[in-house]
Swiss-Prot record:
Pfam families xref list: RVT_3
CDD domains: RNase_HI_like (cd09279)
InterPro entries reported in the protein's UniProt record: RNaseH-like_sf (IPR012337), RNaseH_domain (IPR002156), RNaseH_sf (IPR036397)
Organism classification: Bacteria, Bacillati, Bacillota, Bacilli, Bacillales
Organism: Bacillus subtilis (strain 168)
Superkingdom of origin organism: Bacteria
Protein name in the entry: Uncharacterized protein YpeP
GO MF entry, a single one: nucleic acid binding
Domain RNase H type-1 as annotated: residue spans: 71-207
Amino acid sequence: MKLRPHLKIEAKGTGSVSFFSEDWLTAQQARTFARELGRFPYMKELEFEDEKGGSWTLKELEKLTEELAQEPDDITVYFDGSFDKESELAGLGIVIYYSLGGTRHRLRKNKSFRLKTNNEAEYAALYEAIREVRELGASRNSITIKGDSLVVLNQLDGSWPCYDPSHNEWLDKIEALLESLKLTPTYETIQRKDNQEADGLAKKILSHQFVESHTKLDRNGDDDIG
């Protein structure tokens, strides 16, 4: 979950002044920020706004942070789909990075389905990726979704209209799943060269190479095999 502070300061002879920050903080950062500001006598009011416009007091934020400490945070999803026209077999590549208990983790997985087009494969890859996020236990949080499919990401964020009935079905399924988990998505279109990890997984399963790994990462983002 991302939050930004709204605060009111009152000093002698000047009355109160309200401030609003445009910078987003994680729940943990917001709690630390609130504790530090709470030490100053001129602080009159402090609340935090979440990405959906909700307000949180420090007391509510303390409780939320304790609850979220047991759930994945700082979640980034990479997805990609490959499609073989002759067999109508779609390969789905999924990579999820997240934090839990102060440690970074990475989930890598591929799946295959019978579909009709490459765009459907891209939609299916993202849908299955969000299902994996659900299995990790994530909810009420922010999620960054990255892929190289302009069709999927631009239709999801509303930049492009969607006229294809099958695409609309996938859009509805993805949005319903995100809503049920209370996840707030940010969509980022990336270059294909920056999506090689998910792309490689999607292609491997078309060659019957199944991959499923769940790895703890070290501080440099590398596999922690020690």
